Amino acid sequence: MSDTYERPRRRPPKKPNYKPLIAVMAAVLAILSVVAIAISVPGCTPRQNDPTLQSTTTPTTGPTTSAPTTVPTTVPTTIPTEPPVVKIGTATVAATGDILMHMPCVRPGKQADGSYDFAPYFAHVQDYVLSADYAVANLETTLAGTDGGYPYSGYPNFNCPDGIVTSLKNAGFDMLLTANNHTYDTQTLGFFRTQQVIAENGMDHIGTKPDAESDSYKIVEINGIRIGMINYTYETHSDPNKVDLNGGADLKENEKTLINVFLKDDVEGFKTDLAEKLADMRADGAEAIVLYIHWGEEYQTKHNSQQKKMAQAACDLGVDVIVGGHPHVIQPMELLESETDPTHKTVCLYSTGNALSNQRIAEMRLKTGHTEDGILFSFSFAKYSDGTVRVENVELLPTWVNLYTSKQTGKKVYDILPLDDQIEDWKTQFELTDSTLTQAEKSYDRTMKIVGEGLQTVQNYLASLPPVA
């Protein structure tokens, strides 16, 4: 037997099965691809501060540290404030008493060429007049000239040379009052010519007007303050269709509406008429009102009940200052309170007396000397940035007419003296004799006895008002 060795046949090795591994790897790659795609697509990246995501986060069981909270910064809000109220202007008005041109006052003014000049009468008071922003005087005479049949004359029918207006203007006066009981002393001629002469001298006037179309008042703008001024006089006729001045001078039909008048016993009628005119003045821009009024009883140093009622009516209508005339003597000053508006007050000087006249003690039945006394009444208005206008200050300067004969000309001089208590030596300042110095001192005392208390009341009230820069 043959030995033959047959190696046993080896089975080929079993190939590894990679299919499961490939499947797993494919699955992993698929997952990674999805994640990669998610990351690469805008808007799909998780936001750390997304409140929606945060709300789905499972809280940990351990202690956590809160992230610092950012508090938003608040920007302060600026609250607008009103600008402070400040004074933006003042206006001072001066008013003097009656310019009552008796013939003894007229004659010394005549010059060699026939013209008239009364400048020496105002020489000492001129600086005080000029210190005001605006000055007013009551012209108690007419200016009819002499060509129309009227001579120059004094009481009872006054007609004065035109030179009195020129002299008043040169002394610093800006306005003349033309409504008084002597307005019609030279009838129609004097009524209109007086207004014409005043206008030709570049001065204002109130109380009368040249035609129906003209205003019955004047709005004067002084340092940016619009001050309304109006002038009334009493009349003596009860007939509503007539106007009678001085007890016998009936104005013609076409003239009766050209003067501001009132009946003494008709306070309501006066109030109604004044209210209408004040409404017009305010519509024209008046920010303050001054009433100049010819009223009262001659030679009475105390105002009467009718004056009191009329003053109260004017106060109730909002008038700021009342300047009275006609009695030819000084009457008291008073502070009135409105009965319709307790916040409104009115300063009232019932009479400024005589600025210039021949009513001397020697000529008068009244021997007290009061007819020789006058006042330069100064009052100031202040205007503020909020539009308010109010009376700010009031001053009274007593005046006295010193009658003497000039050594240079030999003529009489009616010298209006400002009795300023700041002047230590009146005798030297005004070249007075011992006798005339005594008279001046008595005049000052008479005046202050009448107005001193009321003046103090007014000044105390004004001083009590809240100060404004």
Regions found by a protein language model. Give the residues of each.
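N-terminal Lys/Arg-rich, disordered targeting/topogenic segments
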Residues: M1-P20
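Short, low-complexity, disordered segments immediately C-terminal to signal peptides
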Residues: T45-A67
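Acidic, metal/ion-coordinating pockets
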Residues: D3-E6, V24-A27, I31, A36, ...
